[in-house]
């Protein structure tokens, strides 16, 4: 899968928000926020092909977590991103 184009990740007061750059990408009823790990993952894969294994390896390289936790978090992140329509 790949991140959809037209989004910018912004940090505002320690929070990470994904902003649509065009009117058709903006849903004013739903704000897409990321925690630090999700923001890191987005920055690493933005515009590139990736899968759950890619995210798992990125988490293992950046954070001190077990492989089991990294896999679980990677899969949950992908599911969240699919649900809000920012990957395809």
Question: Over which residues does each language-model region extend?
Answer:
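Acidic, low-complexity/disordered tracts enriched in E/D and polar residues
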Residues: 1-43
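Long, charge-rich, low-complexity alpha-helical segments
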Residues: 31-88
